[in-house]
Amino acid sequence: MRSTEVVIIGAGAAGLMCALTAAGRGRKVMLIDHANKAGKKILMSGGGRCNFTNMYTEPANFLSHNAHFCKSALARYTQWDFIGLVAKHGVPYHEKKLGQLFCDNKSSDILGMLLDECIQTGVSLHLDTSIEEIAKVDGGYQLQTTLGELRCESLVIATGGLSIPTLGATGFGYQVAKQFGHELLPTRAGLVPFTITDQLKELCGELSGTSVDCLVSCNDQSFRENILFTHRGLSGPAILQISSYWETGDTVVINLLPDHDAHTWLQQQQVEHPNSELKTLLGEIFTKKMANLLAQSWFVSKPMKQYTHAEVADIAQKLSSWQLVPAGTEGYRTAEVTLGGVDTREVSSKTMESLKSPGLYFIGEVLDVTGHLGGFNFQWAWASGYAAAQYA
């Protein structure tokens, strides 16, 4: 039987950070993953450029049934700490927008940096390795694996959620949590495109590929970014963000004119452009195709001077408060994250250690902590991995 001090299951962002940090403080660390490569999600993230953190990270950027849980870890390993690591390795990066930091070159720069740190600190990495059984024993945990029997003092679960199963996502971490008496909060896809009802399919299909700056709202949350029409429904940053707050049957409200008071703008057009058709004026804000389709779907296009006060009010309402009830989401297949997971009320916010089973730790996406779009989920991976590594 092989013995080590720390076994980390899951060689993604959180697992790699935990491994290199624990090994860096002198712990003997074994990092295990069932995949044939480490950090697959890192490689595909950010369109291949890895949005590795956000300069404006704060606890308000995270969803959890236990809102205060993430505060301690985020304060002890900040975005600036990770940016310092990136700078130390000479990885060039830039801010794209809204504090989102991306590699100048490719995501493999970030993965390479983490793997280099693991090599330097002496982490033992084992890929293509499956866990068959875990048992609590005196002084730690015993694992039956395809490598043989392992024994460790500390066991860290960094297996992620259910999103993007083609990259190897499974519910393994949730099974371990249940085995050791933890409550699981219901899981669902987050940061995911919406599918739409039949009556909207024609409009979305016709506008497929069109991107529009909007204010999207649901359940007292709002995001101002682009939406993207697709053949399947609605996507784009604003839709992905609001999807984490949406539940089946909820109404989503889209303001297509976020820079204007729609009613005032329409009245202004009646004065300044009385002979212009509304679709022509909207064509200066949206694409001409979108303006024409909105005219066909929502109102009769005619010279501005011909609209009554009631018609102007009705059009303003549609443009500033387009209400729709999505049919659903595209699910885990395309979701960037998994909402829900291991109930954080049963985990120490300081150490990430289980309050049910000493020596067992949970980090990253397996926990009920989900960030907004824009590098926040990676920052949670770095911060939670670092926190556990101080104690594991």
Predicted regions and their residues:
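Glycine-rich active-site loop/strand segments that organize a redox cofactor
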Residues: 49-95
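Glycine-rich loop(s) and the adjacent beta-strand/alpha-helix scaffold that form part
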Residues: 154-197
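N-terminal Rossmann-like FAD-binding beta1-loop-alpha1 element of flavoenzymes
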Residues: 4-31, 388-392
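Short hydrophobic core segments
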Residues: 7-9, 32, 131, 150-166, ...
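An anion/pyrophosphate-binding glycine-rich loop and adjacent beta-alpha core
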Residues: 36-38, 43-44, 52-59, 92, ...
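Glycine-rich FAD pyrophosphate-binding loop
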Residues: 23-47
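A glycine-rich dinucleotide-binding beta-alpha-beta segment and adjacent secondary-structure elements
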Residues: 127, 292-370
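Feature captures the FAD/FMN-dependent oxidoreductase FAD-binding
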Residues: 76-154
